[in-house]
Amino acid sequence: MDTLPMDKKNAISDMGFGGLLQLGCKELRYELITWIVASYDIGYHRLCMETRVAVPVTPKDVREVLGIPDDGVDILIYNRHGTPNHIYDIKILEANLRDLLVGEEFMKSFLIFAYATILAPNSKQEGMHDLWDTVWDSEVGVRKNWAKFVLQYVEDGIRDYRTSHPTYIRGCVLFLQVFVSQPLHINVICVCQNNFFFC
């Protein structure tokens, strides 16, 4: 996304996703992610410290960390039962981002690319197919609560990880890592050379 021309970056910002263009953290720290997943209370949407401090996690936090919309209608994922009207391929999305002029197809390609790679990744290289279909079949201009969707999806991923022990945690664990690394939370969590100390 760094190589996109300014008019495309402006269109992404106008959609409410400008924060993704400025993400500073692009590498996951697996020891920290493992600790976050073990300490996360899905039922109450909070991170529980050993010091009995609980840090709530809300869609507003997702908006502040990732710079995506946290208002509007809820995202409803439609399960397609017929043949899809497109191919699920990240390379096609990358080509669309590079080659298409700013317009509805460009914006849909960006949304799907962002969700397949950053906001709602799963163990497949191309993300959740039903989300592709939902975005392709909807209007881009409708304001949606993408932050709430991201939080629900990563919480569902944590739940699946705990119950079925897959090798991959689906969802935006990058959000959780950046969230706990913010100055506001560093007073609660001190991270030093992959060891976690509670202040």
Language model features by range: what are they?
Residues 1-104:
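N-terminal leader regions that mediate targeting or early regulatory function
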Residues 71-73, 85-199:
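Long, internal protein-protein interaction and assembly surfaces
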